[in-house]
UniProtKB/Swiss-Prot annotation:
Top EC class for this record: hydrolase
Superkingdom of origin: Bacteria
Protein name per Swiss-Prot or TrEMBL: Protein/nucleic acid deglycase HchA
Cellular localization per UniProt: Cytoplasm
Protein residues bound to Zn(2+): 86, 91, 123
A GO biological process held by the record: DNA repair
PANTHER family, sorted: PROTEIN/NUCLEIC ACID DEGLYCASE DJ-1-RELATED (PTHR48094), PROTEIN_NUCLEIC ACID DEGLYCASE 1 (PTHR48094:SF20)
Entry annotated with the keyword Zinc: yes
Upper taxonomic lineage: Bacteria, Pseudomonadati, Pseudomonadota, Gammaproteobacteria, Enterobacterales
Positions annotated as active site in the UniProt record: 185
Enzyme nomenclature, EC number: 3.1.2.-, 3.5.1.-, 3.5.1.124
């Protein structure tokens, strides 16, 4: 006998009119164990360069009908790339716009994963006690030890990051100083911070979560309503090219900008980023 799971968004009782994804959508798009593999870096980096993670600090995203989507950073999209980079020898720091703790989509946490969960527990304090991004930006110069900026996905990346002058300044610094920029899924929404000033990403090609897919997710209760705007449309207006129209786990490299299309690309993006950064800094 087949048990039917509900497509109704689930109530988040921590906030008025807020909702988690439906049981059905979670059954289709989350798993208690990740697809982490290929973590093999026999000659890891031994230097001081590290990763700056720009994380989400807000949980609730308004939708077109007034309901709130309970979101944050997607755990798979955050932790799998970092697992690879850490195994390759690169430590990381976490910053948020406010300096307040990172918000995660805990409903997507691979809670039975025997590698990812210990890694998360080991580094949880970094996400609970992040740096304030403005303080990091104020200290950036050509000699700063950050080798890359990583913006994880999850719909939380749509909140605050696209309008942040500090995000714009961090990205401008990274591109102009030949550092890596790594992102996936909804994370590239942060690139919209460059819209109203110097935009060094004009003409770059990336993978990202397709707007067309976002427009379909309310049908299965992943979100309680439709988005009020779509970041892919806006990225194209600022001169960026999104090369994928589906979510097949695709990754892409354009110079030092490394991107993936969805949580299905998290492991592959981690591999790509680790390999590229080792070639640049440990070769």
């Amino acid at each position: 006998m087949t048990v039917q799971t509900s497509k109704n968004p689930q109530v988040d009782i921590a906030e008025d009119n807020a909702f988690f994804p439906s049981e059905y959508s979670l059954s289709q798009y989350t798993s208690p164990v990740s697809d982490l593999d290929g973590v093999d870096y026999p000659k890891p980096y031994r230097g001081k360069h590290k990763i700056l993670v720009i994380a989400a600090d807000e949980r609730y995203l308004p939708t077109d009908n007034g309901k709130l989507f309970s979101t944050g950073n997607h755990p798979i999209e955050t932790l799998l790339p970092l697992y690879h980079l850490h195994a390759a020898g690169f430590e990381f720091e976490v910053a948020t716009i406010s300096g307040l703790m990172t918000k995660f989509e805990y409903w997507a946490m691979p809670h039975k994963d025997e590698k990812v969960m210990p890694f998360f527990e080991q580094h949880k304090s970094l996400f609970r006690n992040p740096k304030k991004l403005a303080d990091v930006v104020a200290s950036l110069n050509a000699d700063s030890e950050y080798a890359a900026i990583f913006v994880p996905g999850g719909h939380g990346a749509l909140i605050g990051l696209p309008e942040s002058q500090d995000v714009a300044a961090a990205l401008q610094w990274a591109i102009k100083n030949d550092r890596f920029v790594i992102s996936l899924c909804h994370g590239p929404a942060a690139f919209l911070a460059l819209r109203h000033g110097d935009n060094p990403l004009n003409g770059y090609s990336i993978c990202a979560f397709p707007d067309a897919a976002d427009k379909q997710t309310p049908e299965i209760g992943y979100m309680p309503g439709h988005l009020t705007w779509y970041f892919g449309e806006e990225l194209k207006k600022m001169g960026m090219n999104i090369i994928n129209d589906d979510i097949a786990g695709r990754v892409h490299k354009d110079r030092k900008v490394l991107t993936g299309d969805s949580p299905f690309a998290a492991n592959a993006l981690g591999k790509l980023a680790a390999q590229e950064m080792l070639a640049a800094y440990a070769g």
